[in-house]
Amino acid sequence: MNKVYSLKYCPVTGGLIAVSELARRVIKKTCRRLTHILLAGIPAICLCYSQISQAGIVRSDIAYQIYRDFAENKGLFVPGANDIPVYDKDGKLVGRLGKAPMADFSSVSSNGVATLVSPQYIVSVKHNGGYRSVSFGNGKNTYSLVDRNNHPSIDFHAPRLNKLVTEVIPSAVTSEGTKANAYKYTERYTAFYRVGSGTQYTKDKDGNLVKVAGGYAFKTGGTTGVPLISDATIVSNPGQTYNPVNGPLPDYGAPGDSGSPLFAYDKQQKKWVIVAVLRAYAGINGATNWWNVIPTDYLNQVMQDDFDAPVDFVSGLGPLNWTYDKTSGTGTLSQGSKNWTMHGQKDNDLNAGKNLVFSGQNGAIILKDSVTQGAGYLEFKDSYTVSAESGKTWTGAGIITDKGTNVTWKVNGVAGDNLHKLGEGTLTINGTGVNPGGLKTGDGIVVLNQQADTAGNIQAFSSVNLASGRPTVVLGDARQVNPDNISWGYRGGKLDLNGNAVTFTRLQAADYGAVITNNAQQKSQLLLDLKAQDTNVSEPTIGNISPFGGTGTPGNLYSMILNSQTRFYILKSASYGNTLWGNSLNDPAQWEFVGMDKNKAVQTVKDRILAGRAKQPVIFHGQLTGNMDVAIPQVPGGRKVIFDGSVNLPEGTLSQDSGTLIFQGHPVIHASISGSAPVSLNQKDWENRQFTMKTLSLKDADFHLSRNASLNSDIKSDNSHITLGSDRAFVDKNDGTGNYVIPEEGTSVPDTVNDRSQYEGNITLNHNSALDIGSRFTGGIDAYDSAVSITSPDVLLTAPGAFAGSSLTVHDGGHLTALNGLFSDGHIQAGKNGKITLSGTPVKDTANQYAPAVYLTDGYDLTGDNAALEITRGAHASGDIHASAASTVTIGSDTPAELASAETAASAFAGSLLEGYNAAFNGAITGGRADVSMHNALWTLGGDSAIHSLTVRNSRISSEGDRTFRTLTVNKLDATGSDFVLRTDLKNADKINVTEKATGSDNSLNVSFMNNPAQGQALNIPLVTAPAGTSAEMFKAGTRVTGFSRVTPTLHVDTSGGNTKWILDGFKAEADKAAAAKADSFMNAGYKNFMTEVNNLNKRMGDLRDTNGDAGAWARIMSGAGSADGGYSDNYTHVQVGFDKKHELDGVDLFTGVTMTYTDSSADSHAFSGKTKSVGGGLYASALFESGAYIDLIGKYIHHDNDYTGNFASLGTKHYNTHSWYAGAETGYRYHLTEDTFIEPQAELVYGAVSGKTFRWKDGDMDLSMKNRDFSPLVGRTGVELGKTFSGKDWSVTARAGTSWQFDLLNNGETVLRDASGEKRIKGEKDSRMLFNVGMNAQIKDNMRFGLEFEKSAFGKYNVDNAVNANFRYMF
């Protein structure tokens, strides 16, 4: 296309001459054609002395791919990337691109010879006289040059394009122009990069050159040093390829690079700017490049010359009327008496069209004629409405809406023409009927709100293309444009569904910049019914068949002339044999004959390409985001659907019905070299992709989460197969080119942990679903009639898991860690190198705290060598373990975690099962091949067990359950500081048999007696059998609290018979005071409830004196808290309502009434915790004498519903009902010290009846019981109150304070405890306390009163810490 001026020595002139490249369109021409052009322009006398050569020369010790990626912003060279390392082919660091963020070269044309500096203008050198068009981005759109704008005196031009470029952002232009030495100032200009497409060479350190490719094959780029000369020309020496001053990626521009840009990073403006275009070089073996600096004044003038006078709309004068004469190419915009002349296309001269700029708020334009503006565009500085008279259209270079503007466009376009839209403002399409034109938008917002015509037809555009990553298109409704005609070009843009339901049958997305979103509050429904494929097939090339054999591309068309006839064949293999002898043309494995009709042969290839596309997977490179649900029905032909972009639907559901769905990362795109694919399955560098949605719904589907993909979503699976961490992957061999997707399927296994896929969420499996986990996993699994297989070493179950009729297998290096409990009605299996860890739940914001968790399964099968089961950090696991292979079982930890207090009922239950240990297991271990270790752990034998070795530290092994005795057989036992608890019925016992070796010390051997031996009964029951020579000190008799007793067995060691045996002789038992005290405290909870009600019996008296009316209704609420020894505390809320009637007798007011009460109380202590809900009712009578005396009588019945959990003697939770009766009498006398001050002595007596209760249960295998009989408390109280009344016109308030002594006259009920060691009786005691109270009673109106009282007590065994009583009374 172009040729840098080459300086050659001419013997005729005796000096250097500039040998020019008279460029033509030769991108695909041969060097011979280029040489011919050159020969025509060079004096013949000089040809024998000057070499015709062209090159872009780079270092040979750096991979050529680096230079290619640099030029196309691929690989590591993403715009904005910082401190990019550059390595040589041996992996040694050459240097870093650390002086500036990576430049964006998208403004450079696809062929590298020009750069976009304004939406409609490019810059290059004027000696590039042959090129007529340019393209940008992935090169899918071509822009024609309508005016070359050649500079009159320097080698520079700034061509104008026919349309506004929508794919890319123009490059910023230097603000310093040709200022002397401007670009030598390294404090401001910190880096210089270039890009070009000349013939490619590499150079070694000895200067040897190797040709890589011809001119214009592709672009390369690199660094250059600080200019040696900087004025109108920049001169530097990038040809000194290994000189560090030129940076780590020197790139010497040479013939073929004419017009290519030189960029500089302007640190002051914090952006890259184009400063110059390449003009000349110093020969292939030289080092110097010459660039012409951008003449900014000239450039600005060129652009300014293409504007007509600006149009300023004046409000109140009516719309701007736009008339246009197509013949003259001129038009007029008029408002009132003011006119503006505009220029449009004249004949075929697009450049005759000038740009128009509109200002004036809320402007209005009416097209009276169709306007053909050629290369002229419209720019709106303010908001406008543009409409047209019926059928009138507008065409031109495009529309720019400035930031903050909203232009309403009511004008339809022309078929075959696209409206190009730029600018940060909004363009609202609001025409009528069907607009046959298309839209290409590169910035801002376009709202499609086309209105229906009289026939109901709507089409805002025939097609929509979004590019550059900046634009948004908003759908007014679902009929605005055929979704299948929406495409996303280079870097894409956002399609906002705006709450509409939209169906795509194909997705045309060039890259990750393609976004489908919904920003509306109304949820959109997106249906991806991807049954259509691209039917545009390029004309296939026809290769020639070599008679001597060769290689080719299977599926391509080839020809050969035989007997003067051209025969056409389709190649079936990558290589073929000789066609002269052995004739490979007859081999169906190598060739398929498709006739001698060229057109039919070509059509056959096209048809097969289309047939292949019908089966090809669908790959979507873009993004789905926002408020929407996405549905993907089965794709015809069994085509798979692959997302290697991203999904972000936090409140949305993505559903797949049948077929295959794959979420995966995206291979990093690299620049192609000589036709190489931009991506491959075996490349190491992949981009991570994130997939987030509320729910992924799968039905009869096959789902894969593959490498470099993260999925954050719940999954609902119905008869589907889920593979997390799949090695299945797809690449698009046309990725980054904008061409039709060419998928390649294969496997790709990540090399690093960061490249592995990961999942977070909860999965529900139903109806024969299958889940294979090979990725990092965090979340929960509920499986019903399904199967789960784990091979990932990083699976974390953070939610409770449920497996019903479902299998769970961990194998091949898989590691399952469960943190929140698990249920399974089947066996969990650990295969070879599989590990299962059962743990408590980590407490948030703590370093080492865990809440207990329960694991209930039918069992665990350790079936493969090196299988492992770990129960640790607050986990309680139940279910037998069977080890059929050499495996390990770990219970507890030598570095145990701190167990947190329970916050949930499940956690509290789990904690109670641990019995103070760090971890617990309940079940048998069989198979004889497991190595078991215990640290601070509890093992409750659920059956006979056989293991290879057992290491026990600070742990306990006990046997419980039915009355069947257990035998633990172990080859090697190593126990220290541990407790072994065995049961006996005085005839048989649980046993421990050690067959090979027993070591250890400080172990306790405890016995749980299922029956109580008779006094003096001698036993002779072997408990432990170990090999001869085992130390007799390994086990000693231990004391164990069982029930309410401390039980110590009596043992002797027998070393006869070739074994060492520990034999049980009998036991000693004594009462355990702590356990008995806890039991007594639990049984006395009824007394505390009784006292709560007692303190509520007499709280009505302040309401009655001096009341008006014959009857009254009242309500009160009392809230309080109390405490006692043993960590006891309670709190209660008491609600009481009543109704009474007043009887006025001689000298006395008698009130008789009825009351209903409800009390909600809770209690907690070292021994128990629980709640009581009480309801009751009663009758009362109160007599108030005029003398000041009073008598109050009450009788009440209360029913108590109790729910308490005891933490002693394995009591557990008990739910029981009790009741109580109350009969109370109170009397007192109010002495008035003054008219408004009084003192009131009081006396009260309460007699009651509290029902007894009996509990029977087992602690281990020991029968226990607790009982207390009905008892009748008698409580007295004496005290005095002092009060004063404050009165106003319509109100009065009586304040009072008092103290009293409350005391028991009878002992509380007796508690009887019984266990295997006998019966223990705990007699009830008396209690007393001092009460203090302050309060007030207010008369609000004649018939309303309100009272408030505070109370507490001291000096008692049980005290009221605080109580608040509020009452309200209404008289009528």
From Swiss-Prot:
Catalytic machinery residues: H127 (charge relay system), D155 (charge relay system), S258 (charge relay system)
Post-translational modification note: Cleaved to release the mature protein from the outer membrane.
Listed GO CC annotations = cell outer membrane; cell surface; extracellular region; periplasmic space
Signal sequence, renumbered to the chain = 1-55
Record-marked site positions (Cleavage): N1095, N1096
List each copy of the Peptidase S6 domain by range: 56-301
Name the keywords, alphabetized. Answer: Cell outer membrane, Hydrolase, Membrane, Periplasm, Protease, Secreted, Serine protease, Signal, Transmembrane, Transmembrane beta strand, Virulence, Zymogen
User: What does the free-text pH dependence field read?
Assistant: Optimum pH is 7.0-9.0.
Q: Does the keyword Metal-binding apply?
A: no
Summary of the function given for this chain in its UniProt record = Involved in intestinal colonization, displays in vitro mucinolytic activity, serum resistance, and hemagglutination. Important to penetrate the intestinal mucus layer.
Protein name in the entry: Serine protease pic autotransporter
Species the sequence originates in: Escherichia coli O44:H18 (strain 042 / EAEC)
